[in-house]
Design a protein with these regions (language model features):
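N-terminal signal-anchor module of multipass membrane proteins
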Residues: 2-76
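Structural signature of hydrophobic alpha-helical transmembrane segments
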Residues: 49-64, 100-118, 160-175, 226-240
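C-terminal ends of transmembrane helices
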Residues: 17-21, 45, 66-78, 122-136, ...
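Internal active-site segments that recognize and position negatively charged phosphoryl groups
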Residues: 152-211
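Exposed beta-sheet edge and beta->alpha loop/turn motif
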Residues: 350-355, 438-496
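Core segments of small alpha/beta cavity-forming domains
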Residues: 370-437
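Internal/C-terminal transmembrane anchor helices
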Residues: 320-348
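Membrane-interface helix-loop-helix junctions at boundaries between adjacent transmembrane segments
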Residues: 75, 79-169
Length: 496
């Protein structure tokens, strides 16, 4: 409990009922410490991590939350108190919420400002409208974000990516800040155990999901996110760590009591894991993570009734007191694990269409480019894609182009379908037969391209080849479906 000091700033003539006072922030208030960590993450996001979020959007979220809090409390109490809780809710909204189309570096963009304002307003209002036992039932920013994502959809409201970029000084500082600040603050509030139980349970469930072969698509990864990459993305994401230390540990909306707190943390981890196991896109996975907390907060009164706070609240004593308690906990845990396994096995992104084996093509030395450059866009995708990968994909694309030449010459549409897909295949099929040119390739550029009309779509590799065809200078740019091999050309970009 933080003791706040009240300082009167305005006194009206008449009785004391007309006296207004101001309650400033206290340096001992844990909410101020949480705010300092989250604001520091926001600063790093702007200067080092490339957040697609403007300063204006942050201010709209903070300002809306603070204004509504003051309008709801000041006239009734005649106390103008520093809106610490509202500012935390507004900052939580701004830290997670993104509006597609916002560009990093456009500091004062008000693009989608109304989405931030409405979500922040919903967060604060939920504290006063949805209550149980004299306190908010749901975590304000959590319930507001989930409602925004489910109602508005990915084209209007999108959660911050789980992957925050390749390891860098800025990202290392972010991890240090979240971990150090999270441990210190939750330890002071006696909630470190809640964070630990959640993370251990969640990480174990995500390991089960990954080992079951589950994967998801993400707008920052060339292929499906699977295996070790899936586990590290979910278990070690800065966004998940913020959820662990600063969202599920809200003292006002978490379960009270030592045992109830442990059950609450494990329940959130289990609920989120079950929902995640059935998702095949990063967007749905992020919403599922947040939705797990909503579901458990809705059932928080049941958890507190099952494990009431009191003298016999020690987890070991509670666990051993009644056999029925152990049966219930183990039964719920087993059911959750079974659902995690089922979801992980049955839900996966649609597999690419199978094609017949590619014909063998032997590249001449003059068809292997001497120079393969890497574009800046490759730094914005997850996984590992280096020079060797780029050279393999370029060779694969050159082979595909030669196969297309052969298919056009012979009118073999089936052959073309082995190395082409989508709009490019449709274009090739319509070409009249013509002699295959003698091509050479001198240089290549490998970069990443995204579909501006589909914000959540996976990126494509963009391969630009330069050389000659029948002795005439030739260059072309292709969008290909590929990770490190078996490239299939999806589109040929017309030269401008």
């Amino acid at each position: 409990v933080v003791e706040d000091r009240v300082h009167p700033i305005v006194e009206h003539a008449g009785d004391s009922g007309n006296r207004w006072s101001f309650r400033p922030p206290s340096l001992r208030d844990p909410r101020l410490h949480v705010a300092s960590v989250l604001l520091s993450v926001q600063v790093l996001g702007q200067v080092a991590l490339g957040f697609e979020l403007s300063i204006a959007q942050i201010l709209v979220s903070l300002g809306t939350a603070a204004a509504i809090e003051l309008l709801l409390t000041a006239p009734r109490t005649r106390v103008v108190a520093w809106p610490a809780s509202a500012l935390l809710s507004g900052n939580g909204v701004a830290l997670i919420l993104r509006v597609p189309g916002t560009e990093h570096g456009d500091w004062w963009s008000l693009h989608g400002w109304y989405v931030f304002a409405a979500t922040a307003a919903l967060a604060v209002l939920s504290k006063y409208v949805i209550r149980w036992g004299g306190r908010p039932l749901f975590n304000p920013s959590n319930i507001a974000l989930v409602v925004a994502f489910l109602v508005l959809g990915s084209g209007i409201a999108d959660p911050q990516d789980l992957w925050w970029g390749p390891m860098s000084i800025g990202l290392a500082l972010t991890y240090t800040l979240i971990l150090a600040g999270g441990v210190l603050i939750t330890r002071r509030l006696h909630l470190l155990g809640v964070s630990a139980v959640f993370w251990v349970t969640f990480a174990a469930c995500m390991a089960v999901v990954a080992l079951a072969g589950h994967s998801m698509t993400a707008r920052w990864n060339l292929g499906p996110v699977a295996g070790w990459q899936y586990w590290t993305t979910l278990a070690l994401s800065p966004e998940v760590l913020i959820f662990v230390f600063f969202m599920i540990t809200d003292p006002r909306t978490g379960a009270r009591g030592r045992t109830a707190g442990m059950l609450y943390a494990a329940s959130v981890a289990a609920a989120s894991s079950v929902l995640i196991a059935f998702q095949t896109t990063e967007y749905a996975t992020k919403v599922a993570l947040l939705s797990g907390l909503v579901l458990v907060c809705a059932g928080r009164p049941l958890i507190e009734a099952f494990a009431p706070a009191g003298a016999g609240d020690a987890p070991r004593a509670w666990w051993s007191a009644q056999r029925g308690r152990r049966v219930v906990v183990c039964g719920v845990g087993a059911a959750a694990l079974a659902l995690v396994v089922v979801g992980a096995r049955v839900a996966n992104p649609p597999a690419p269409p199978s094609t017949a084996a590619r014909p063998d093509v032997e590249l001449r030395d003059d068809q292997r480019p001497d120079v393969v450059e890497l574009g800046d866009g490759l730094a914005t995708i997850g996984g590992s894609f280096g020079q060797d990968d780029a050279e393999r994909v370029v060779d694969d694309v050159v082979e595909a182009v030669l196969v297309i030449d052969r298919a056009v010459e012979t009118g073999d549409d089936e052959l073309a379908g082995r190395v082409a897909t989508g709009p490019f295949l449709a274009d090739v099929v319509e070409r009249p037969p013509s002699a295959a040119p003698d091509r050479s390739v001198d240089a290549a550029m490998v970069d990443v391209v995204r579909n501006p009309d589909e914000f959540q779509a996976q990126p494509r590799l963009e391969i630009t080849l330069e050389g000659s065809a029948d002795g005439v200078p030739w260059s072309s740019t292709y969008h290909v479906l590929a990770t490190t091999a078996d490239a299939r050309i999806e589109r040929e970009v017309p030269e401008v």
